[in-house]
Amino acid sequence: MKSVAQTVIAAESFYTIAAKTGSVIQAVETKEGGDIRLGKYEHKPEQEWAFVREGDGVYRIRNRANGKLIDLMMTGTANGTWLHLWEDVGGTSQMWTVEPTPAGTVRLRSHWAGGKCIDTVGMGTAEGAILQIWQETPGDDQLWTIAEVKDRAKRAAKTEEPKAGAVKAEPAKAAEPAAAPVAAVEEKPAEKAAEK
């Protein structure tokens, strides 16, 4: 088993978490206790997540839209416990371990529920699938691709036309894709992340 130290998760970045089908984990409702399901990626903050490091390989997964965390409903530990959004209460039901797989995907394991994996109800991977935890199975519904979200505002600023009288800069290079899969798997300090 590879350690989380092999997954690049930058402290100041946001990520999509995608199923094999390309559907991403999203906050359907951004209120306290709101649903978390799979959906088509539309560059919305409800679909983007920060991994907040809590310790050796342990993270809180924070939603970009509202700052709420992926949490276990009623702090459940049983197979089939649904995930929902909740404010940061410092509880271990909001802590997750990122475990790389040989295929380049990851399993997201509950630190609270004995390592059960984020999974979809009924093994669904299509849009609308509800998220839960379940003991490890060989199915694709527990395998996730974490991809960094490129800051669209910075990319747009590079391609804007200069104002009249301003010196025109070199043409912008082709825009990068909205999300690039995380391939290397190691922690990098925020300072090194800022250099790139």
Regions found by a protein language model. Name each.
Residues 1-176, 180-196:
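Lectin-like carbohydrate-binding module/patch detector with strong preference for beta-trefoil
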